[in-house]
Amino acid sequence: MSEDSNMEKAIKETSILEEYSINWTQKLGAGISGPVRVCVKKSTQERFALKILLDRPKARNEVRLHMMCATHSNIVEIIEVFANSVQFPHESSPRARLLIVMEMMEGGELFHRISQHRHFTEKQASQVTKQATLALQHCHLLNIAHRDLKPENLLFKDNSLDAPVKLCDFGFAKVDQGDLMTPQFTPYYVAPQVLEAQRRHQKEKSGLIPTSPTPYTYNKSCDLWSLGVIIYVMLCGYPPFYSKHHSRTIPKDMRKKIMTGSFEFPEEEWSQISEMAKDVVRKLLKVKPEERLTIEGVLDHPWLNSTEALDNVLPSAQLMMDKAVVAGIQQAHAEQLANMRIQDLKVSLKPLHSVNNPILRKRKLLGSKPKDGVYIHDHENGVEDSNVALEKLRDVIAQCILPQAGKGENEDEKLNEVMQEAWKYNRECKLLRDALQSFSWNGRGFTDKVDRLKLAEVVKQVIEEQTLPHEPQSSEIALLVCRAGTWKRL
Amino acid sequence: GCGGNGLVLSATDSRACRKVAVKKIVLSDARSMKHALREIKIIRRLDHDNIVKVYEVLGPKGSDLQGELFKFSVAYIVQEYMETDLACLLEQGTLTEEHAKLFMYQLLRGLKYIHSANVLHRDLKPANIFISTEDLVLKIGDFGLARIADQHYSHKGYLSEGLVTKWYRSPRLLLSPNNYTKAIDMWAAGCILAEMLTGKMLFAGAHELEQMQLILDTIPVVREEDKEELLRVMPSFVSSTWEVKRPLRKLLPDVNREAIDFLEKILTFSPMDR
């Protein structure tokens, strides 16, 4: 309660523009909660990072947890937070938002750093690991699980060789009260317990298993699994759990590897990496949380405390340069963020010969494959003209219904053009002629303001009148010839 | 499941005794409600074998929306239920060639219908293409709702390196985000065909700039005006000889020649050539 009131006091109601100028077009990156931009403090000309969130309970929670953690030197600092109404160019009105001013991390992301420094050493990797672990320890001491630990959320303060590493993006963070059960993850770094929570969540949802009074939960140790994956990638340049196919969701083979903790140390890259480093990775990537190395265990591990020289250059720098690998990882991230679901259902397709598909049925009725370039018509010329007339009428409906993005005058001209075309092909239609009179149509244009929805309704009736005596148009054109004439016929 | 535009549930229409899908759309302001309802009117008028049928649109607790356009912040779209979508199928690997041909044929058939009504889909992707596993009927769904209902910020300038991936976007749309024509649906259809035949996304860039790079590696640029625009927009990424590093035939070695020929004609850089 006292924490909440302190947090609420810290959020300013004054306009951020009084103290900062904002570069709206320059985006530094994107977290789960949205893009991060540059802002400059007017009084000191200092540059900061600005994250803008819609003011919602979830956003307030993110701010609260980040502020609770941000007192540590390995966690990105929150300078101040504003609650303002902000209107973006595509919006029709301002919306309540939280604007979070954070310290600027000039050194960029971990992977980017590794790919730039081609002589990234095992010692440097252990130093990064130590700082990330200290940040994580600080969160866990406050009983906060980060839940989205991944290289993109580890940033360097600046570009110097010994720049500190800091943890950012608390969009998924949550207080661990024994109730962590909502599946929150990005692929490659997800702990098996989170996948299991996801699986049970889905089965409960579809009714395959009853909703349990004691739901399956996981705990802060999911962050330690993610840490193990990050160390593995830092050392060799590719993730331990992967699939040969880039996919929009976690593929089955990758999920199985995660759930069973199956990974390898391929000889080509790992022969030059120390046994101590492998030991840390093995002990972190334990499926059972109780067997997993603890935070203190990581900090006490010889790999992080060795005075022995670990100057061997890691293969990760070269492999990190491989664009396909990075692109694959980023693609999986992006897709997973956009589509937080896993498909369990197995769908199989019937062979064509045992399927009662309308297209296939029509082909059988026709008894042969269609000739090249020929539509099969009921009537040759009449239907052609009729099709054009109907198409023009449909254009009128589309023009009336489509959202009007442009100026009113342009839209009115377009409507007149489209209506004129339709009128040209439908002059004999009495229903249309009578209807247009009530809309002040003078043969070339509308002289008054048109109620577009009513006009669309009237034109629809005209189309229905013209199509009633015949079969619907989609049946009249029985087959469509593919654009590429040489492609095999269906 | 959860569609991109909100929660989607399956249900049974107790009056009509049919299985339906009910999609909940949260509308945050009057403008997006107005746009969404206009899109819904378009959808309800589309009546074709290969288009998902929308039965009705309701307000909260099943109330009729007639005449009360601006009173609600949510709307429910009651539409035809389809067992699965193409994204789920492709998740399991490639389709057989005959399945791919049947689906592509039906996709083009549906597109011909909506384009003849001067309507653009604008967000064609496997997740918006629904399949009935009973009779292998394919239906196009989610017309424009992604654009109307998801009022996310869209970059109005040139290529950006944002996290949003646009794997089915045509080169024209990458260069001019608001330049919507029927040709962009055809580009997306071509990418989807390639994905059905290979099980892999054709151009899976991590961001728009890389998306364009992947396209340029494979699709030749033949028109001078396109070359001039590319040199203006992304000069350091265009090779001086305009050679494609991986033409479609090499990119998709296991796909037969006739399908490659089809793809080469539908996946042209310039929308006019498609």
Curated annotation (Swiss-Prot), chain B:
Its main location: cytoplasm. Residues 1-274 form the Protein kinase domain. One of its GO terms (biological process) is intracellular signal transduction. GO terms for molecular function: ATP binding; MAP kinase activity; protein heterodimerization activity; protein homodimerization activity; protein kinase binding; protein serine kinase activity; protein serine/threonine kinase activity. A motif (SEG motif) lies at residues 160-162. GO terms for cellular component: cytoplasm; nucleus. Keywords: ATP-binding, Cell cycle, Cytoplasm, Kinase, Nucleotide-binding, Nucleus, Phosphoprotein, Serine/threonine-protein kinase, Transferase. It comes from the Eukaryota. The modification Phosphoserine is found at S160. The active site is at D123 (proton acceptor). Exclusively detected in the brain, where expression is restricted to the choroid plexus and hippocampus, and to a lesser extent in lung. Activated by phosphorylation in the activation loop. Atypical MAPK protein. Phosphorylates microtubule-associated protein 2 (MAP2) and MAPKAPK5. The precise role of the complex formed with MAPKAPK5 is still unclear, but the complex follows a complex set of phosphorylation events: upon interaction with atypical MAPKAPK5, ERK4/MAPK4 is phosphorylated and then mediates phosphorylation and activation of MAPKAPK5, which in turn phosphorylates ERK4/MAPK4. May promote entry in the cell cycle. Homodimer. Heterodimer with ERK3/MAPK6. Interacts with MAPKAPK5. This is Mitogen-activated protein kinase 4. It comes from Rattus norvegicus (Rat). The lineage of its organism: Eukaryota, Metazoa, Chordata, Craniata, Vertebrata. The gene is Mapk4.
